[in-house]
Amino acid sequence: MIESVHIRNFKSIRDVTLPLRPLNVLIGTNGVGKTNFISFFELLKSIFQQRLGAYTMDHGGIDRLLYKGRKVSDHIFGFIDFANTNGFEFLVRPKQSGVGYISYTCDYFNKNQENNKAYDSWSKKLWDKNVDESSLITNNQWRASYLKNYLNSFTVYHFHDTSNTSPMRGYCQIGDNVFLRENGSNLAAFLYTLSQTDKRAFDLIEATVRSIAPYFKRFDLKPDRNLMGQISLEWLENDSDFYQNGYSFSDGTIRFIALATLLLQTNLPQIIIIDEPELGLHPAAINKFAAMVKRASLHSQLIISTQSSNLVNCFEPEDVIVVDRKEGQTVFDRLDSNSLSVWLDDYDYSLSEVWEKNLIGGQI
């Protein structure tokens, strides 16, 4: 689990240290910087996977990633405290070519296993210095193996593309089934594997989909006989034998199927990060999604960004982090029940009403 994250000079985030819990729901209106916080984990993953150069260029160059550009910021700094045992730190600087390079990466090891946040007293090891890409992923030292396990433990999921060209709707390779991909492109293959290896989870996913789409009877997943090694999201409708596939689902339903598959699998990812999962979901589906999130948070750490009033109402104040923009910077404030008691108890406001009335920030 991530204990805390320290970010400096990344997009709209000037300098923030944010402790995290098993469940973290970021709420805020458009433009405050929720997605920038989520994007930080994509940057971190790109460093680990030796894709920093590609990542910076895909996002318009390093100036687009630096807080107010290189005229104001000359580096991006990140530090992640994993489970109070390991810390990973990096510093990225700009090159004249417009990409970023790694000034250094290092890790800290809490060898005494004490609840000690004086990281300078932890054992420190330098991994990279003044390189274009990190070498950590190919390092076989015992200490690197622990760090790689942590850095490989999270994925940012975006199930936004539900268009007719969405990879969730069409064919995918049946062998692409080890884990659900971040855009759901192997949804059919992953579900098929669950149906063969984890029937209990597969049945639960079907039942959950049925609860928000009563016309849905069950999935009818099988390898295509004409397209060798391919599979698509075929399913059966109640009271009909008409052929249905992924193109027959509404945008909200296919997004919900991907979310249910992610959250109801038995072998959950250690850290699950989801950007705006509420898009296109009916209020009843949002409530179901929240229930799945709470269930998953008993076994995994979840970080979710949203601007849905219905979704935030499903959680306790301590689960919610209000994201706001002040003096040109993104700031974060975790709620607590005691400070909100006058609004929640005395005035009988819901959590979303407190937010919508701008009593806790997060509204521009």
Language-model features: locations:
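Electropositive, glycine-dotted interaction segments
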Residues: 86-220
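Conserved P-loop NTP-binding catalytic core
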Residues: 39-100
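N-terminal pre-Walker A segment at the start of P-loop NTPase domains
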Residues: 1-14
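Conserved ABC ATPase signature
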Residues: 203-264, 271, 277-284
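ABC ATPase nucleotide-binding domain "signature" loop
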Residues: 28-31, 276-281, 311
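Short alpha-helix of the ABC ATPase nucleotide-binding domain corresponding to the H-loop/switch region
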Residues: 282-287, 317
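Phosphate-binding glycine-rich loops of NTP-binding sites
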Residues: 21-59, 183, 256-257, 305-308
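C-terminal lobe/lid and adjacent interdomain/linker elements of RecA-like ASCE P-loop ATPase modules
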Residues: 1, 290-364
